[in-house]
């Protein structure tokens, strides 16, 4: 939509030797500020931004979107410990918990459940919401804004591919490729959902 990637180049996604890989690389994509993904570096970087902002007196919040599979990485929990230690109440992590990752379901991986108590044990304020419910998400953001003395995590229980009939809850669409016909179908279904949404633009 913004012309950063030529439409034809999109067809090279996850093809050997191209710059559009499953884990984005900031070396090859200059508009991507850093390389994150399933190695779990994102929360550490977001914590650094939050720490720096507080020390400089900047009244900003740092947000980090994590995948459920990503939180199997030790790096995430090291950052979680540090964030609680430094009482980073300007840090908000959102975990997209859809139960599917990199070609497998979470059921075949070491269990992360019970999940919320883990974050709470690390000193975080933890909220769980149905992640495909826009109003529930906005209410959780609103709650997080009023938490003092600790970081907040929102665990959003989502359905992967929600709103696209052939993608919903299908592990193969973790990194699947669409044809022109499937793209048009997905765009049509998503646009219909967007038109049906109420106005959730105001957060007090």
Feature-to-residue mapping (PLM):
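Short acidic, glycine/serine/threonine-rich loops at helix termini
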Residues: 25, 75-77, 103-107, 139, ...
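Conserved thiamine diphosphate
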Residues: 57-60, 107-140, 191-202
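Glycine/aspartate-rich loop-and-adjacent alpha/beta segment that forms the canonical ThDP
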Residues: 134-204
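Acidic, glycine-rich active-site loops and adjacent beta-strand->loop/helix elements
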Residues: 16-19, 66-73, 97-101, 132-134, ...
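A glycine-rich helix N-cap at a beta->alpha junction
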Residues: 5-12, 83-96, 120-124
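Cofactor-binding active-site loop characterized by glycine-rich and histidine/acidic residues
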Residues: 1-85
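A short alpha/beta connector and helix-capping loop motif
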Residues: 73-98, 153-155
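Generic beta-sheet signal
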Residues: 60-64, 91, 150-156
């Amino acid at each position: 939509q913004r012309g950063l990637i030529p439409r034809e180049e999109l067809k090279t996604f996850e093809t050997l030797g191209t710059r559009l890989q499953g884990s984005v690389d900031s070396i090859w994509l200059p508009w991507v500020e850093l390389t994150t993904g399933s190695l779990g570096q994102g929360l550490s970087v977001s914590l650094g931004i939050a720490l720096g902002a507080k020390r400089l007196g900047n009244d900003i919040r740092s947000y980090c979107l994590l995948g459920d599979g990503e939180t199997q990485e030790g790096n995430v929990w090291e950052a979680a410990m540090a964030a609680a230690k430094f009482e980073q109440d300007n840090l908000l992590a959102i975990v997209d918990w859809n139960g599917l990752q990199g070609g497998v379901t979470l059921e075949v991986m070491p269990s992360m459940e019970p999940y919320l108590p883990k974050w709470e044990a690390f000193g975080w304020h933890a909220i769980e919401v149905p992640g495909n419910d826009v109003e529930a998400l906005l209410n959780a953001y609103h709650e997080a804004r009023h938490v003092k003395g600790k970081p907040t995590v929102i665990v959003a229980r989502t359905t992967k591919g929600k709103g696209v009939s052939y993608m919903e809850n299908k592990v193969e669409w973790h990194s699947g490729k669409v044809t022109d016909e499937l793209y048009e179908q997905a765009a049509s279904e998503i646009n219909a959902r967007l038109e049906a949404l109420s106005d959730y633009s105001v957060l007090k």
